Swiss-Prot record:
InterPro entries reported in the protein's UniProt record: ARM-like, ARM-type_fold, WAPL, WAPL_C, WAPL_dom
Residues bearing PTM Phosphoserine: S77, S226, S228, S355, S388, S452, S468, S470, S914
Gene Ontology molecular function: ATP-dependent protein-DNA unloader activity
Location in or out of the cell: Nucleus; Chromosome; Cytoplasm
Modified residues (N6-acetyllysine): K168
Positions of short motif FGF motif 2: 437-439
Motif window: FGF motif 3: 462-464
Species this protein is from: Mus musculus (Mouse)
Compositional bias annotation for Low complexity: 503-513
Record field: compositional bias (Acidic residues): 65-81, 466-478
Entry's Gene Ontology BP terms: cell division; mitotic sister chromatid segregation; negative regulation of chromatin binding; negative regulation of DNA replication; negative regulation of sister chromatid cohesion; protein localization to chromatin
Official protein name in the record: Wings apart-like protein homolog
Keyword flag Cytoplasm: yes
Amino acid sequence: MTSRFGKTYSRKGGNGSSKFDEVFSNKRTTLSTKWGETTFMAKLGQKRPNFKPDIQEIPKKPKVEEEDTGDPFGFDSDDESLPVSSKNLAQGKGSSYSESSEAAQLEEVTSVFEANSKCSHVVGEDSFASDRCLLVEDTLIGKEKSISRIPEDNANKSSCTKLLTSDKVENFSEEHEKNSHHFHKNAEDSTKKPNAETAVASEYKADETKETNDTWNSQSGKRTESPSESCPVKGSVRTGLYEWDNDFEDIRSEDCILSLDNESLLEMKDEDLKNRIGGLENLNETFEEDIIQSVLRPSNCRTYCRANKARSSQGASNFDKLMDGTSQSLAKANSESSKDGLNQAKKGSASCGTSFRGTVGRTRDYTVLHPSCLSVCNVTIQDTMERSMDEFTASTPADLGEAGRLRKKADIATSKTTTRFRPSNTKSKKDVKLEFFGFEDHDETGGDEGGSGSSNYKIKYFGFDDLSESEDDDDDDCQVERKKDKKRTKTAPSPSQQPPPESSDNSQDSQSSTNNAENLDFTEDLPGVPESVKKPISKQGDKSKENTRKIFSGPKRSPTKAVYNARHWNHPDSEELPGPPIAKPQRVTVRLSSKEPNQKDDGVFKAPAPPLKVIKTVTIPTQPYQEIVTALKCRKEDKELYTVVQHVKHFNDVVEFGENQEFTDDIEYLLSGLKSTQPLNTRCLSVISLATKCAMPSFRMHLRAHGMVAMVFKTLDDSQHHQNLSLCTAALMYILSRDRLNMDLDRASLDLMIRLLELEQDASSAKLLNEKDMNKIKEKIRRLCETVHNKHLDLENITTGHLAMETLLSLTSKRAGDWFKEELRLLGGLDHIVDKVKECVDHLSRDDEDEEKLVASLWGAERCLRVLESVTVHNPENQSYLIAYKDSQLIISSAKALQHCEDLIQQYNRAENSICVADSNPLPYQNVTNHVGKAVEDCMRAIIGVLLNLTNDNEWGSTKTGEQEGLIGTAMNCVLQVPKYLPQEQRFDIRVLGLGLLINLVEYSARNRHCLVNMQTSCSFDSSFSSGEGDHSLRLAGQVHAVQALVQLFLERERAAQLAESKTDELIKDAPTTQHDKSGEWQETSGEIQWVSTEKTDGAEEKQKKEEEDEELDLNKALQHAGKHMEDCIVASYTALLLGCLCQESPINVTTVREYLPEGDFSIMTEMLKKFLSFMNLTCAVGTTGQKSISRVIEYLEHC
């Protein structure tokens, strides 16, 4: 429904502006509309709940073409003439119309019957003539049939009217006569014992009411043909408001169809009814109005009944009974209806004045609703229909009494000026009309009876549904369902006989208990109620204001808590009929008056049982070899409200993001302090702070990852002009160089580093600065450098050049790339390094220098030479540059350093781990890392390494190096004599380096070959051990020819290699065979073969451990033996290569070498060289130039 339908009922004009005022003020049953003079029949419906479920399962029937299109109230047409169905009266308003006297009631009955004579076939089989002269359910059932038969069944109007009149008056007279004590004696005691009286009254006259209804239904004609489409809640729709509801129900189920053609019976009832009308003249006028508005329709229009009213007739009769003046209360009616075994609460709540949708306060015409979609209270209901009748009948409501009914009528008459959107203390005329037609949703009205049990209801205002014009089969369904419901109601226990509820907890379990609270509210408003029951009218106005706010403005504030029906919505009961499933079950909160006599606990709140959260679905495979898939799903409506946050990061991602953000903040802050615009002290402090951060490896990682190193040094490009800033910058570079990974330096950063190296620390520059400030900066840098690896750093001599040199050495040592080698040469870095080497060598030549300075000089020279070695390997440009730099300054310094080291290594002998000098004096330093011998050893290896690179495949380098005085002799000593002063594991290295240097010197230089051949040297220190006693004289002889010493070295190493090979072959031949595993045996058990381990004794375990240890020792010995064999082979190979190089282009040298060889055969040398070449090709240890040289020597020796 759209909001355009709200125009009819939201008029804000003055009193008397509506056509309905004629009905209220003049008490006339005719209404002048644009279709003409029509008889107005209003049926007080129950209050509709504020719930509107979707009706998706109910098929809508197409409209019958022959139906009368002249809708008297225009619910199917335009906005201006949208009529109000009088049957949609609010439950509370219907109950507020109570009979004041028997004469008034008789007059109302007479007027109702007169009006009904103008209406054609408005009543279904289950007529509610006895329930306020017409049950809403019957009119609803007969809706579609009667609509389609309006032009045809005019002849039946008078008969129907007579039947209704006679039936109703007869039943009413009997009810009034038999149960007058129930009608009037409870006027004052309704609040005390309403439930019991209601039960008595409703059981007393149920049969008679049903009989009259059946007669009326039979006269009206069968209208329902398709029971399958009718609503399954028919029987329960009926609520026992009247005392004769039980009799009415008994007769209805039996005589409904049988009396269809029984015209004689109709006539009898008509006559009897007329006779009884004369005896009921004293009935209240309210009863007449109620019957007129809710039962009868004008003669020129169809009956506006809800399509599902077949089961709702009892609910209508509840309200009729409340208005008839009978002492039955609304709660009793609801308990009667719940006896039917159906969801009476749904029907009761269906009459709530407003829908849950936007069309608040709207009522719908009965003619527009599908028969299966309507309830007693003119509200569309769509529910699971699986709740039992006991679900809503926990307690009985209290009886209003005659005084209460009089009070209700007075309230209606005085509160017609209020609109539904304007709450006030007194009801306006418009409010009365809205309440009269069921458009105001009041807590105190009877509509709240369905509040607790109508959580699954869907409310629609009648008059706007396309299902109203459905076929006749829908009415047939309703008829059959009503019959079953009547029987069920007849057999069901009446909850009205239960004691009144003690608190609002009882009202949560049933619909009738909620109606009980509503009836109590009615009683409060009645003018004739005693003071103990009566409440001020202002309280009623306040409740109306609160209810209006709740309906039209959202949740209202109430002194009491909301009351829910705690029963589950999806648990069917045995007596319930299946109904159309509900798409979205909802819960409607029911608010009770805080001043109810029976409500003791105002703060009790019972939440309903939670619905099934998980739905199990089983998918049957459609193809073979597929499995059945079972899934558990939860509907979105059943899930709790939660906020979905997309793209949530993982914990590790969040931590990483936080770290990155912290780094970004720090670096941005520190960079802002490094700018040249900042004061000098600020820049120095920022640099030291950044260096402190860089002491952490993680921060250095961030700097490299984000490329911030170059940016930092670019900002500090002018630091060389400030002594303190340059010192801080050098400290920052040093800290960054501590990382094992390459520091991403660009050309500008390297240039800055080299410029810092060039700074001279003279006194004049030092005086320019405050000495105190410099000391502070140095102290900070010293503490900072203590936290990092500072093996080679002199903490007592922290200068800019020293820090920059250490940085450069740490960067270029083993980690310098090709671009770095080139930039270092182009920017002048190599010059500074060569100068540093010269400086260190000069310190070595001083005799008075103490050992600490000696070690520092040795470490400085060694580190500079390591850098030069790394930048000259496989780089001819750098080699040539260094050879030519300052007339071979590097070669000269290296030669001097090598000679100093030869002298120092003899002084600080480290052979056999004996740390002693020649005079047997203990060394001043026992720490190996600071030992002089270790420093000398490392420095010797660095010097020979640089010379190897400068002389490799370079004749110029070889010549320049060979020209150095004593260099060839020193190299020969490194091969023959120096290894004896070194530890065993270091001898091989120094010997191979010496042999390699000699090979490079003599390979391309004839001068060097000549010098070496004519040189006198000592024999190898270990030649005597291999020669035995017979060669002892050679060792004592002292000096020998260099060629003879080299041939002797070759023969010794070659013999040692052959001996090692023979031992290895024996080890291979004597390898033990695999012994039988004695740890267990295979056994066959139970038809299976299993390995069963034998129990080991302690002795066996110890023996096994000993064997394992022996095997490990043997393996170590084998490895050592193999290593010794390899060393011997390599030394022999290098010696043979050196001898081969001496023999090139020199027949004299060939003859000299042949003399010292066994039998003068070079085959022993060529075989060793071939093995070495194969090994070199296998390991790719050297470049192609070395392999070519070996191949050339082999070829030459083979042709000798």
